[in-house]
Amino acid sequence: MPKYTPEEVLDLIQKEGVQYVDLRFSDPFGQWQHLTIPAYEISKETFEVGRGFDGSSIRGWQSINESDMLAKPDPNTAFIDPFIEPKTLVMICDIYDPVTGERYGRDTRYIAQKAEQYLKQTGIGDTAYFGPEAEFFIFDSVEFGTAANYAFWRVDSEEGWWNREVPSSGYKIPHKRGYFPAPPVDKMMQLRNEMVSIMSDLGIIVELHHHEVATAGQGEIDIRYDSLLNQADKLFLYKYIVRMVAAKHGKYATFMAKVLPNDNGSGMHTHFSIWKNGENLFAGSEYAGLSKTALYAIGGILKHGPAIAAFTNPTVNSYHRLVPGYEAPVRLAYSARNRSAAIRIPMYSQNPKAKRIEVRFPDATSNPYLAFAAILMAAIDGIENEIDPGEPFDKDIYSLPPEELEGIPQLPGSLEEALKALEEDYEFLLKGNVFTEEFIQLWIESKRAEIDELRFIPHPKEFELYWDI
């Protein structure tokens, strides 16, 4: 996204005839919130003082007796919304406490900013680069609901392998074979092209896009790496564009980790490296062309993997994806080129600038401010303490017999297991006051409340299994 000063934003509003300004920010759980004000209300003071709003209405934020909050727009994030009329300019905001004048501790964008600053304070590096590959589904119809006497969901897609008659029965993608046939089999190419064109117009550099393994419109758009905060901001915009383009065409996009029970889920493989003074610290002469720094970073991520999964895979649904047989990692191992490992070292290029690791277990239901910050903090801990990642695992982990799997640590099998791991292993996140104990406890309590909400609802499959016993 282009970078602006407050004065340049005000000039842009006048030049483009902007009528409304939309102020956006994330709640703790990764959902964009917004408030809209007429453009004539925007002045230089707006950037200095901010705009007041009710923080008690945001899930996980203030109580009603301390509800006043301030949203201060970041001019560097300004863009003209291509979907909204009349012409509307959007800015992402930082959240402040109006009483103390300080940043709000539950503003997850602040956590991301603190993580970037802490990296510099350690002297290890000055920039952490992230390149997420956020996968999604596009459906033609979606229905779901729960009530006192029912619980159900139903999705459909013209690409769905279960639709064998109409429409386009001659161009169906066979089950789990969506990677990646050309049109007319790939019916979503034009939609993705439109998404990419809008992303490019708004400053998000796209490297490629393609259909994914699952049928029913699963796709992936890969965006070029960027620094932690910039990339997290871009990921919110990425998801917004995907959803809005789908909606424009009467379709429905979702980033849920597991939608279809017998098909691949949607992940967010995250490429990651640390740089200093323009030099890639992950390039070296060790295994797969990595440096010792990179291996220690891997050691930290593997050691703290169960804990950071509470942020990178933050929903009950996330763990329906992390099962064998659907190209998602379940074991905390690392390897070159090996997509069955939790961490893969891509080998596409021998250029030292391209050397990175790919953390394969996250999904796009995560809040990227928290997910990226947690990955970075685990890596820093690994580097500072020279945590040995052990030997690489170059075998296909999915095909190993049980006796060979015993020595390989597992990712959590459920959100409850991930929260338990976070509860027992969060000291590394507190360094530099990046995460606070108060925020971590809020996260654990909120997520356990989600688990309880689901725990008391019988699953429709239970009726098939147990109705007439």
UniProtKB/Swiss-Prot annotation:
Binding residue positions for L-glutamate: 264-265, 321, 327, 339, 360
Activity regulation text: The activity of this enzyme could be controlled by adenylation under conditions of abundant glutamine.
Annotated GO biological process: glutamine biosynthetic process; nitrogen utilization
A Gene Ontology cellular-component term: membrane
Superkingdom per UniProt: Bacteria
Domain GS beta-grasp: 16-100
Domain GS catalytic: from-to ranges: 108-469
Residues with PTM O-AMP-tyrosine: 398
Cofactor(s) demanded: Mg(2+)
Binding, ATP: 207, 271-273, 339, 344, 353
Entry's EC annotation: 6.3.1.2
Keywords: ATP-binding, Cytoplasm, Ligase, Magnesium, Metal-binding, Nucleotide-binding, Phosphoprotein
Matches recorded under InterPro entries: Gln_synt_N, Gln_synt_N_sf, Gln_synth/guanido_kin_cat_dom, Gln_synth_cat_dom, Gln_synth_I
Entry's cofactor comment: Binds 2 Mg(2+) ions per subunit.
Residues binding Mg(2+) 2, per UniProt: 135, 212, 220
Keyword Phosphoprotein set for record: yes
UniProt main location, coarse: cytoplasm
Binding positions (Mg(2+) 1): 133, 269, 358
Family: Belongs to the glutamine synthetase family.
Functional description taken from the UniProt entry: Catalyzes the ATP-dependent biosynthesis of glutamine from glutamate and ammonia.
NCBIfam families: GlnA (TIGR00653)
Subunit description: Oligomer of 12 subunits arranged in the form of two hexagons.
Protein name: Glutamine synthetase
Lineage, highest ranks first: Bacteria, Pseudomonadati, Aquificota, Aquificia, Aquificales
The encoding gene: glnA
